Amino acid sequence: MDLLSRARKINAMLQTATGKSVNFNEMSASLRDVIRGNVYIVSRRGKLLGFAVNQEIENERMKSMLEERQFPEEYTRGLHDIRETTPNLDIESTHTVFPVENKELFKDGLTTIVPIIGGGERLGTLILGRVNESFSDDDLLLGEYGATVVGMEILHEKTEEIEMEARSKAVVQMAISSLSYSELEAIDHIFEELNGKEGLLVASKIADRVGITRSVIVNALRKLESAGVIESRSLGMKGTYIKVLNDKFLVELEKLRSR
């Protein structure tokens, strides 16, 4: 396969990912087929976002690392020192992706490190591994192109997470602002007693203790439930089961308490 055809496969990977939830394992598999080597996409903190192997590595430590999807902290810190593509590192390198305890078995193992940069910051690292054959200039070009595509997808995912956080926070703030003073007071006492994200409580007991009517509690819970912030379910004489659905709710409630 010539360079142009291989580059087009990476480009197709970007077009396929557009508008969809990112699957870094699929991206790794595409890069593996194009570069013909083992591919690991590692986040800035060492989380293994995706991987695909061309050659299986029979090593318990490596298997455990892939299952846990986490690279060692010391190794990850070392990757941050590499600021540009560094090709064909041998088994003696501290950055080798091959198990050093099996040096004889992987004495011809070569590792290439490609930083993933996006929006002016280090987002992670693309690690390529191959045995017996060094990475050519064409491979490095494709690796850097692949890292750029992966970086775009990581940025896209981060943007979506930020937008989702903002939406969740806005929903909670609107729900809380819809409560009357007495309803807000009731909610404060309810979740103080609940002391967590879910649990069982008896509304009438809280109403008697705080000195508010049961209807105030019911209305307050109904407003939060209609906003999708909580779910509640009556269990008859046992009380009412309440579960927080929006993680931002308890945070915002705590802010109100500290004012």
Curated annotation (Swiss-Prot):
This is Global transcriptional regulator CodY. It is found in: Cytoplasm. Belongs to the CodY family. Residues 1-155 are annotated as: GAF domain. DNA-binding global transcriptional regulator which is involved in the adaptive response to starvation and acts by directly or indirectly controlling the expression of numerous genes in response to nutrient availability. During rapid exponential growth, CodY is highly active and represses genes whose products allow adaptation to nutrient depletion. Keywords: Cytoplasm, DNA-binding, Phosphoprotein, Repressor, Transcription, Transcription regulation. Its main location: cytoplasm. Signal peptide: none annotated. NCBIfam families: codY_Gpos (TIGR02787), PRK04158.1 (NF003170). The gene is codY. HAMAP family: HTH_type_CodY. GO terms for biological process: negative regulation of DNA-templated transcription.
